[in-house]
Amino acid sequence: MVVHVLILLVLGLVTIADPIKIVNVLSANYSGEEGPEVEEFTIEEIDPGDISEMEEEVVEPVDVAEAMEMVEPTPMDPMEIATVDFEVSDFASEMAPAAMSLQTVSSLNVQAMSSRSADMKKKLLRDYGGNESSEAAVTEALKWLSRHQMPNGAWTYQHNLVCNGRCGNPGEPNRAKAFNAATAMGLLPFMGAGQTHKAGEFREVVFRGLRFLVQNGKPGTQGGLPVLDLSEGAGNLYSHGLAAIALCEAYAMTEDPELLGPAQAAINYIVYAQCRDGGWRYRPQQPDGGDTSVTGWQVMALKSGYMGHLIIPPRTIQGTLLFLDKVQSNNGAMYGYAGPTTRMRASTTAIGLLCRMYTGWDKKHPGIVAGVEGLAKIGVLKNDIYYDYYAAQVLRHYGGEKWDKFNVELRDWLVSTQSQDAGAKGSWHFPNSASHRGPKEGGRLASTSFATMILEVYYRHMPLYADAAAEDEFPL
């Protein structure tokens, strides 16, 4: 409570402009001025094409038994998440004036996650193409995920160890210690369905997962600000981005003060880890610059953090815009991995377009129009659920006939391919997946997480381009 009062006092010092139409995006002006010199960070050269070469020991590894018996949920004490200490005054200098602030649906007077409430879910499910079958599939998926949570609250890509091999297709062995990434992928579908550690049928599941993330993170200080490092050798900054999204969404949905410190500290680590070109890669401040895939997860975390009124330095978003400019081609309709591409790369283009939507490009921007056209031509890729996950978000926000066609095919395919086998009921596995950093490496857990979040796309977030706002230009 004291922390919230202090934040409100600081916010009271910020001059707020006249009310404007609120749009769910992040934006910032580029001032043209160079930011502060980034401290040199020396690391080994990394081959971006082979993540398996980056194995290292987790600082505090979590023991995983070779086989585990399922445990019954135990009554939970009040929230015992260890907070990361910080002072509100530490962030006062990072807050942007009202004219430069990052805009979001949660700004000042809108509930950030209202789309996940029971009544709004029903409306958005109906309006944007969900149905009873897709919701039933989500319910079964959450049951499968809950059955595969470890006793310590974590999830593992070696999910078969938790269920004593009752369902197969675990992730690759070199992902076995990516507990933070796996736990985030286990948690996010619950929160997408409106479940929190405070309310819902699965609140104890969510509580244990959040507690694990906070306790397994590595607290520290960077640039005078507290950070919570959730990266790990088997998942690097992919792990941090995913885990930061989970912490920030949980805080945005509940405003639980116990999560404020960890969520803000996780955001601070993203700010610290940004590369000189404005993107993110496997390691903090990697000298060879960012890549679109890792950058996408960090931008999603920044968006989730700002939806919870956490503090995002405008220069971080300015850097992101520079990175997107670097990797775009065809006037922003296509996006490469670490530089511009001469051919359509499905997954990185979908990621780049979603980042553009979140950072201010409106529905009529030529890059958005042409990019959406390109994704619509590609359609659903049944061998790349990672692409499908991002493309579904882009097309759903864009709306119209292209989304309707894409949605029906993707929705019905996912519903029809959900496992009905006894041990694996409610899950998915795509054995021929070509996904970059997706189910091919994360196994049945990653496949199930992506598929479930796709089926929650109707209500996971409010639409960026609502009919009433579609004609408005976003004020930069």
Question: Residue locations for each model-derived region?
Answer:
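Extracytoplasmic intrinsically disordered, low-complexity "stalk/linker" and propeptide segments
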Residues: 55-113
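Exposed boundary/loop context
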Residues: 25, 42, 86-87, 91-92, ...
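Extracytoplasmic/periplasmic juxtamembrane low-complexity linkers enriched in Pro
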Residues: 1, 6-72
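Patatin-like phospholipase
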Residues: 213
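An alpha-helical repeat/solenoid feature that recognizes helix-turn-helix modules
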Residues: 7, 93-143, 147, 157-205, ...
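Calcium-coordinating acidic loop motifs
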Residues: 150
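Acidic Ca2+-chelating loop motifs
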Residues: 153-155
